[in-house]
Regions:
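N-terminal secretory signal peptides that target proteins for export/translocation
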Residues: 1-9
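A conserved helix-loop-strand patch within extracytoplasmic ligand-binding domains
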Residues: 150-166
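N-terminal module-boundary/linker segments of secreted carbohydrate-active enzymes
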Residues: 35-70, 89
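Core helices of alpha-solenoid repeat scaffolds
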Residues: 145, 149-150, 196-200, 262
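Sec-dependent signal peptide cleavage junction
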Residues: 25-38
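An alpha-helical repeat/solenoid feature that recognizes helix-turn-helix modules
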Residues: 60-91, 113-139, 163-196, 208-264, ...
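Bacterial N-terminal signal peptides
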Residues: 15-27
Length: 301
């Protein structure tokens, strides 16, 4: 198992399920849910929020150590979750944004150190948290020269920024870049180095022979990455548009639609499912993999 990829050392099973619930509920129209199931889901949300808060020794959301560690994966994803669920008050979200802005400004004030310890997807996470909490990632604090910090421009549109090309992190960079710009349907600026079409093409080009996706072409299909790719591609389902790219397996020019690639990817996910319905990653059942598969399914309706 790849230590650099699996996130078990950061996210507990309950925390991952919280992320699942938050994204799932906001991704799907409420009318498609059976009315008698909504109270169960809401109760689940509240239980997980209560567990996380109590485990941190806090009685209120986004306070204490959780807020003090704004800019870290654990705190940011929790803030993202409770903001998307509507559990955090406006005051709590504003307080978290203020602390997160301090963290972002510190990142830009120490770029050399930040580039060594952070990946571009970490900045995407911060941008998504800003959006969820009601902030503006295109104008979030100032850099040491007094210029507004534009997290969207610096991590997606402009590959000449200090964070470089989204692909420098491999497939993860493309996934989170696309998720970030679609979180609020950001418009591509004229002359953007990376466009939606380019990001989508890069993702499609990385489909493995069995239909799934992995970190590199020699890796087996990974449930988490396959599900993450499907989630990122979900806004483009049902379109006739074709994309042309060089497949990493064939080395040849290929043309496909998002739906055609997704059909193969979902088929591979089905093959990686255990008899009890959970998902297997490297022959191991994990809540993270199961949660990501459910998010992908929910995103595609």
């Amino acid at each position: 198992m790849r230590k650099g990829y699996k996130a078990k050392n950061r996210w507990s099973a309950g925390f991952l399920l919280l992320l699942l619930v938050a994204v799932w509920l906001t991704a799907m129209p409420r009318q498609v849910w059976a009315a008698d199931r909504l109270p169960d889901v809401k109760q689940m949300e509240e239980g997980i929020v209560s567990w996380k808060s109590s485990s941190e020794g806090e009685k209120e959301l986004l306070t204490g150590e959780l807020r003090d560690q704004a800019g870290s994966a654990g705190s940011d994803w929790f803030a993202f979750d409770v903001a998307r669920m509507g559990s955090a008050t406006e005051e709590q979200r504003a307080a978290y944004l203020a602390r997160l802005q301090d963290a972002v400004e510190a990142v830009y004030a120490n770029k050399e150190d930040s580039m060594m310890r952070l990946r571009i997807s970490d900045i995407h996470r911060m941008a998504l948290t800003v959006i969820a909490c009601g902030g503006d990632p295109e104008n979030f604090g100032t850099d040491p020269d007094g210029n507004p910090i534009n997290l969207i421009h610096d991590t997606v549109w402009n590959s000449n920024s200090c964070w470089g090309d989204p692909g420098d992190q491999g497939i993860n960079g493309y996934i989170w870049a696309l998720l970030t710009i679609d979180a609020k349907n950001y418009q591509e600026p004229e002359g953007a180095e990376w466009t939606r079409e380019k990001l989508i093409s890069e993702l499609l080009s990385r489909q493995l022979a069995d239909g799934g996706f992995g970190l590199i072409k020699t890796d087996p299909s990974d449930v988490d990455l396959t599900s993450m790719v499907l989630t990122a591609l979900a806004p483009y389902r049902g379109q006739d548009k074709t994309y042309t790219y060089t497949g990493i397996i064939s080395g040849q020019e290929e043309t496909s639609t998002v739906d055609a690639v997704a059909e193969k990817a979902f088929a591979r996910l089905s093959e990686l499912q255990a008899d009890d319905g959970s998902m297997l990653t490297y022959d191991e059942r994990t809540s993270e993999s199961t949660a990501w598969a459910m998010i992908a399914l929910a995103s595609w309706g």
